Design a protein with these regions (language model features):
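Non-catalytic terminal/accessory segments
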Residues: 1-247
């Protein structure tokens, strides 16, 4: 089958979408395209059938796109998907989950995670920190770490430091809500807050406060469940992990 938008459609011929054989066959078929681009002294990047060709002007881009499309279709006998083909500046491109931004001081473009890639990992992390998910918080921390490590190791060649900081802020807030729900009763919340160094007056006030979102933004809860304590519990810091693997 093949995914068309969000709908699965049956297919009788072809290779499975997302299978290991698809990029292998693409590399075999498009090896001659690489030679042709090198012969024309064009700068390009290709992964399987996804290719970017770099030129200096709009006019050159239009000329190259027309001639390379003709080469692919008449010489290689392959069909170019014109809906997915475009001419644009690096900042307009989404390539393998990345986009690019202009670093004016360095006078060059640099890679970063595309906003859709960030939105996708945020949705996944929100699922893993859902208060309705009936697993222990230690399991949640383990699953969060798996997702963060995979995502950061893939995007670490780009500028994602700001993104990792935002992910940490979101995850710590949502994880505090998970812990708060796990404590259940006001009595249990009071006892745990006192154990974590909160004075009895503030602990009693917090324990009787309604609303997860409200209480888990307070100074009392943020102090009791500090970043360091969450880390000791097993919640991975996206920023710290990114700095570690990118240095």
């Amino acid at each position: 089958g093949v995914m068309v938008g969000e709908r699965m459609e049956a297919t009788e011929v072809g290779t499975p979408q997302g299978g290991n054989i698809s990029p292998l066959l693409a590399n075999i078929m498009l090896n001659e395209l690489d030679w042709e681009l090198e012969k024309r002294k064009l700068r390009f990047v290709r992964y399987a059938d996804d290719c970017i060709i770099l030129v200096r002007s709009q006019k050159a881009a239009e000329r190259v796109m027309k001639s390379i499309t003709r080469y692919i279709e008449t010489t290689l006998l392959l069909k170019v998907n014109r809906k997915k083909s475009m001419i644009g500046r690096p900042t307009d491109i989404k390539y393998l989950g990345f986009t690019f931004y202009n670093q004016f001081k360095a006078k060059k473009y640099k890679a970063k995670a595309h906003e859709k890639s960030v939105e996708k990992v945020v949705r996944k992390l929100k699922q893993l920190t859902s208060r309705r998910w009936g697993v222990s918080n230690s399991v949640k921390a383990q699953k969060i770490a798996e997702v963060l490590r995979g995502w950061i190791n893939y995007f670490k060649i780009g500028s994602i430091l700001t993104v990792t900081r935002k992910l940490d802020t979101m995850l710590r807030y949502r994880f505090r809500m998970c812990i708060w729900k796990h404590w259940k009763t006001p009595q249990n919340k009071f006892r745990n807050l006192v154990k974590l160094g909160i004075g009895q007056k503030n602990a009693a006030k917090a324990a009787c406060t309604h609303g997860y979102a409200r209480i888990c933004r307070t100074e009392t809860v943020c102090y009791a469940m500090s970043n360091a304590r969450l880390a000791r519990f097993g919640l991975l810091s996206a920023e710290e992990y990114f700095v570690k693997v990118s240095s």
